[in-house]
């Protein structure tokens, strides 16, 4: 597929290239994001990294609320596991960065206000646990399975029928020198 236009936005006034987008020749806009991780302390007053993460999300919400583009895809490491079954223990992670109420509420607002569909949850029901990230600190990641779903693929509703298959490639976590994230792959017929 040829690319007709590419761009990025300075989110929060910082030129840290956390976003890139392309418009494909078939008029589909593809956005790729890396949302700030947010540091270790889930408090916007005492942790500037967490404050930046929340500000970044709010800016994304404003942007996509105004964006009336049809045929769009959003992918990336959003560093938030929004639903109870996107983490190994909802109760134990409520005060851990990536699953706090302020993060999950803002991500769900972004999803709703931007008219996105969380396509992974169309293929894997909310009742099922699904993870795309496991800590490097846990050597026996499979046995403990203390993961989180931080990597996302969202579609505009007009592309839903194009989505054919979704794969979370957990096997990649066993590769030599793996990432702590595994690929999430959407097969889509554009």
What function would you assign to each model-found segment?
Residues 55-155:
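Metal-dependent phosphoesterases centered on the DNase I-like endonuclease/exonuclease/phosphatase
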Residues 21-23, 34, 153-155, 185-189:
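Short, well-ordered beta-strand micro-motif
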Residues 167-190:
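Surface polyanion/phosphate-binding segment centered on an Asp-His-Pro turn
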Residues 16-21, 149-151, 180-185:
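Short hydrophobic/aromatic beta-strand or adjacent loop that forms the aromatic wall/cage
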Residues 10-13, 141-145, 174:
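Short Gly/Pro-enriched turn/cap motifs at secondary-structure boundaries
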Residues 8-12, 35-58, 91-96:
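Surface-exposed cleft-lining segments at the edges of enzyme active sites
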Residues 1-5, 24, 141-162:
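Conserved beta strand-loop-helix elements of the APE1-like EEP
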Residues 1-40:
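Structured beta-strand-rich core segments of catalytic domains in phosphoester-bond hydrolases
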């Amino acid at each position: 597929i040829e690319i007709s236009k590419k761009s990025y936005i300075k989110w929060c006034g910082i030129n840290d290239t956390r976003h890139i987008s392309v418009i494909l020749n078939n008029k589909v806009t593809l956005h790729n994001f890396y949302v700030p991780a947010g540091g270790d302390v889930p408090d916007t007053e005492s942790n500037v990294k967490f404050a930046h993460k929340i500000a970044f999300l709010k800016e994304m919400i404003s942007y996509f609320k105004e964006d009336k583009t049809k045929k769009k895809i959003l992918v990336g490491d959003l560093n938030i596991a929004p639903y109870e079954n996107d983490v190994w223990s909802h109760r134990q992670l409520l005060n851990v960065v990536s699953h706090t109420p302020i993060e999950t509420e803002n991500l769900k607002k972004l999803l709703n206000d931007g008219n996105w569909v969380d396509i992974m949850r169309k293929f894997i029901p909310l009742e099922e646990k699904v993870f795309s990230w496991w800590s490097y600190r846990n050597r026996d990641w499979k046995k403990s399975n203390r993961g989180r779903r931080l990597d996302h693929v969202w579609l505009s509703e007009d592309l839903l029928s194009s989505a054919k298959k979704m794969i979370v490639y957990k096997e990649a976590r066993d590769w030599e020198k793996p990432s702590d994230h595994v690929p999430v792959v959407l097969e889509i017929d554009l």
